Amino acid sequence: MLVMACDLVVAADNAAFCDNTIDLGVCGTEFFNHPYDFGSRKAKELLFTAGWLSAQEAAATGFVNRVVPLAELEASTLNMASVIAAKPRFALKMAKEAINAAHDAMGRPQAMSTIFALHQLCHSHNMQVYGMPVSTFEIKKP
């Protein structure tokens, strides 16, 4: 999910999120933040089932910062951006670095490196088994 690479997320109340990479025969995306965003059990549930997460559920897990009515999405996002833009830039950068350092201390760089290697291994496996880097439901399992 592209949203995982975002520092802040404002979602419309009708938004839904899904990571269906397992359905494509791949064990996750190149940017893999699932355990950090959801915790291990919820990450496994979402990946193993390719289940959908409503905007409200995403907010409850901390995956999105705010949920607003669709009609207010742009205004709410611009408001948040202007509040942040008015802050001292260096202090913002240092706050972001501190938060990222905390994640790094929890092993995120090693996890990212490992998942990228496993992701590529899945592509290699699919090339050998299916003749393409991703699989589809129509392909019969060997």
PLM regions with names:
Residues 1-92:
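Crotonase-fold acyl-CoA enzyme core
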Residues 54-55, 75, 79-82, 86-142:
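C-terminal alpha-helix plus adjacent terminal tail
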